[in-house]
Regions:
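Loop/helix patches that line or flank the sugar-binding groove of alpha-linked glycan CAZymes
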Residues: 315, 331-350, 600-601, 607-774
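Solvent-exposed, low-complexity, repeat-rich "mucin-like" stalks and linkers
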Residues: 36-75, 221-239
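Bacterial signal peptide processing site
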Residues: 29-31
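Substrate-binding/active-site clefts of carbohydrate-active enzymes
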Residues: 318, 328-514, 534-546, 562-564
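Aromatic-rich carbohydrate-binding modules that target alpha-glucans
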Residues: 116-176, 184-211, 244-264
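Active-site-proximal helices and loops of the catalytic beta/alpha 8
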Residues: 37-39, 44-47, 436, 446, ...
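C-terminal motif of bacterial Sec signal peptides marking the signal peptidase cleavage site
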Residues: 24-27
């Protein structure tokens, strides 16, 4: 389908403005008869869609193009205008789309690169709180609102005092939002709203539903592939529903997409045969709403239908195992250096795990037998000696060693207690020889006070003190980008270009020089996007482009979907952990005050926020949470201090039903879009309260019957997931069949996978007809 180059008919504006800004044309469209996908080296990866802001949206050309200065023109959809800042290669886009989605066309050397844009669908809602006697003496910002829409940040949204009420207008995306008022520092419910839901810690939050406008768009559905593997058939769409079909980053020409009343036929381009892996992406919307999206992988130009064609860098098919190096396996006793101090409890000290222990597990097939193709290692950079911090809420008190690795005293050198540089390389070589990816947990937000860079460049760090002389520690939301995690952990000023340039060079060492396949980034929301954008550009230029390697970066952010999504995109992160979905899944599977309807709502909200084929991490637990199985068994409660629980009582072996609940959690995570993540020990049901009790030593044998059964069930799930195009790339439908039963359907070119989760003690029966199953379904 190679066609001659036809340039679009454009009216160009070349008038220069102050600061190097250029106003670009907005109204013309490229000639659909011309289609030129370029040379293939202009971009790295897929150009992820952009959700436009209500005001101005900054679109960084360098997020998408290796040489952004080579872009010679852009055609923006009707309703948008853009001002270009040449010194930063940023388009400042204003206006509003006329439709829920449209496409911007970037032209470079005769080729069009097409970026999908989403209209901002936020709707303003007015919140009011009644005036109180004597409130004229209150501060002007005495009444505030916190909720899922502002990441529960007490300093984000203040109400204005009026004649009879305090009032504020808040933009909210469609869906259910939880909130409370904060009046003079005290959290209070909305007296005018009786709708409330449990907050997971013993109380309730108000809830408000923002309804979507208009009727739903008809969902996109794959039907079939022809014998050549190069023509796709989809279910038909209404005539008024917009359809956008991209191969890689190029909208296919009109003659390649044929719509009739009965079907949609898509002819794949000849150029696809030249690439071992490429992708077709399909988007659609009616006048008011977007539909789901489709992501279809191609193997040398043919639709990928066989699971054995999936490779380890097909991240949609990744299964991720997270281990804490010090607590996993001791492969080299010669590097054991516990503090053995009376002021450090054993659970807060080094216990001997190291990289040789990880290599031992790799070489004996531990991860492969469990079905995992990706391993995430806790940080291994050099950390300080000695003991730091203090736990004094229970007796005995304890200080902490740096066994966990999150206090970097070097950003580039491995900690000798975990291994030498050659042992790092040996671990990676062993993993890659067995087709395993390895991600490194990396800390960019802060350093330890013994780090040489803090001593040499103190101006690169934020102040420990606020303007009122109070400590700026653990202010996670009020001072998100400047707060210190502790007084001995200086916070990097990631808005300082000089600091960012140097410290991203250090981060690059682990992927470029050692060969890690990507990162898990610690404390993502506390780091400015300048850092993430700079690091990602370096990765593209120095690793991904020259090696043709698809890397993966996943971040850690606790907050609203909007905050989490603000760190995602072609120039930023590939994914983050979906903690909001974890909370809902925990509540449902462990039977902790979340029903099936709520779980469906949160899952649907995640798909809307991150896309239907996102790479978000769906976790069974992590190093900062109580073990799922102990919560499910009632041994630890969410409304208590879950860290103190681990110091004051023994959290023992759970009952049989808790293993079943954990199995359900795993089944949920392995069935939905995103990457299933198993925290070490969760495959067999390791118990524990919160940190450090959730970081017990791993065991590799002597499983109880319940542990062994769970471990085998997880292995079946993971092995199926890694070889299932349906679970990696299929469409998703979620139904709450009752308050206790959830159905998840994934479908991909005629193949369906159904997962039915029933948390009740009563069996639920379905007929083949009810589930629309083929009689020969297995």
């Amino acid at each position: 389908m190679k066609a001659p180059v036809v340039r679009p008919s454009l009216t160009r504006f070349a008038a220069a403005f102050a600061g190097g800004a250029v106003l670009l044309a907005t109204a013309c469209s490229p000639d659909p008869a011309g289609w030129n996908p370029g040379d293939g080296d202009e971009t790295v990866g897929l150009m992820t869609p952009v959700l436009l802001n209500a005001g101005t949206t900054a679109i960084y050309s360098g997020d998408y193009f290796l040489e952004p200065e080579e872009v010679d023109s852009v055609v923006w959809p009707d309703g948008l205008r853009a001002e270009y800042k040449a010194d930063s290669a940023v388009y400042r886009v204003t206006g509003a789309l006329k439709k829920p989605l449209d496409v911007a066309h970037f032209w470079m050397a005769g080729a069009s690169f097409d970026l999908v844009l989403y209209a901002n669908g936020a709707q303003y809602r007015t919140f009011t709180y009644p005036r109180q006697p004597g409130d004229t003496a209150w501060a002007e910002d005495a009444v505030r609102i916190i909720g899922t829409f502002n990441a529960w940040n007490r300093s984000a949204t203040a109400l204005k005092r009026g004649d009879s009420t305090w009032t504020v207008d808040v933009p909210l995306f469609p869906g259910n939002h939880e909130y409370k008022f904060v009046v003079n520092g005290v959290e209070l419910l909305d007296p005018s709203n009786s709708r409330a839901v449990p907050n997971g810690i013993g109380g309730v939050n108000n809830t408000l539903e923002v309804k979507r406008e208009g009727l739903p768009a008809r969902p996109l559905k794959t039907r079939s592939v022809d014998e050549s593997g190069s023509q796709i058939t989809l279910a038909p769409l209404p005539k008024n529903q917009k359809l956008v079909v991209l191969w890689e980053n190029h909208a296919l020409p009109a003659d390649a997409v044929v719509q009739t009343e009965n079907s949609i036929r898509i002819q794949l381009p000849d150029e696809a045969a030249d690439l071992p892996r490429s992708f077709v992406r399909i988007y659609s919307a009616n006048a008011h709403r977007r539909s789901n999206d489709l992501l279809i992988p191609l193997e040398k130009g043919r639709v990928l239908l066989q699971g054995d064609l999936l490779q380890r860098h097909d991240w949609e098919a990744a299964t991720l195992y997270f281990l804490m190096v010090d607590r996993f396996a001791n492969g080299d006793p010669s590097n054991d250096r516990p503090l053995n101090r009376p002021d450090v409890l054993p659970q807060a000290d080094f216990q001997g795990g190291d990289l040789d222990g990880v290599t031992w597990a790799i070489q004996r097939g531990f991860f492969e037998k469990l079905g995992f193709n990706t391993v995430w290692l806790s940080p291994i950079a050099r950390n300080p000696q000695g003991a730091w911090g203090l736990w004094d809420k229970t007796v005995p008190n304890t200080k902490f060693s740096a066994y966990h690795g999150y206090w970097p005293a070097s950003n580039t050198q491995p900690d000798a207690r975990f291994g030498r540089p050659d042992q790092v390389r040996n671990t990676l070589a062993s993993a890659h020889s067995r087709n395993l990816n390895v991600l490194l947990d990396y800390v960019g937000n802060h350093v330890h006070e013994e780090h040489p860079v803090y001593r040499a460049k103190p101006q690169w760090f934020n102040s420990l003190y606020l303007p009122d002389s109070s400590l700026n520690t653990e202010k996670w939301d009020e001072y998100r980008l400047t707060t210190w995690f502790d007084t001995f952990l200086p916070d990097v000023n990631t808005e300082n270009p000089e600091a960012v340039a140097a410290l991203t060079d250090s981060a690059l060492v682990w992927v470029r020089d050692y060969g890690f396949d990507g990162y898990r980034h610690d404390a993502t929301k506390h780091v400015a996007n300048l850092y993430w954008r700079t690091l990602t550009q370096k990765l593209k230029h120095q690793v991904a482009a020259p090696r043709g390697q698809r890397l993966y970066q996943i971040g850690e952010t606790y907050g609203s979907p909007e905050l989490i999504a603000s760190y995602l995109g072609s120039g930023l992160m590939d994914a983050q952990f979906d903690f909001n979905l974890y909370d809902a899944a925990l509540g449902f599977c462990a039977n902790l005050n979340t029903d099936a309807t709520r779980l469906k709502e949160v899952l649907d909200a995640s798909l809307a926020a991150y896309g239907h084929h996102h790479l978000m991490g769906n976790i069974s637990g992590n190093q900062d949470k109580p073990r799922f199985i102990s919560l499910a068994n009632g041994d630890v409660r969410l409304d208590e201090d879950t860290k103190a629980a681990g110091y004051t009582r023994k959290i023992g072996t759970p009952g049989a039903s808790a293993y079943q609940k954990l199995a359900m959690m795993h089944a949920f995570n392995f069935s939905i879009p995103g990457i299933p993540v198993v925290y070490y020990g969760d495959e067999y049901g390791m118990p524990g309260a919160n940190d450090p009790d959730n970081r017990r030593l791993m065991k590799f044998k002597n499983y109880t019957p319940e542990e062994d059964k769970l471990r085998k069930e997880v292995a079946k799930l993971a092995q199926f997931r890694t070889k299932s195009p349906v679970l990696a790339y299929g469409s998703t439908t979620v139904k709450a069949l009752s308050k206790n039963v959830v159905l998840i359907e994934r479908s991909y070119f005629g193949e369906r996978v159904l997962t039915i989760l029933n948390r009740s003690n009563q069996p639920v029966k379905f007929t083949v007809k009810q589930l629309q199953l083929h009689p020969k379904t297995r």
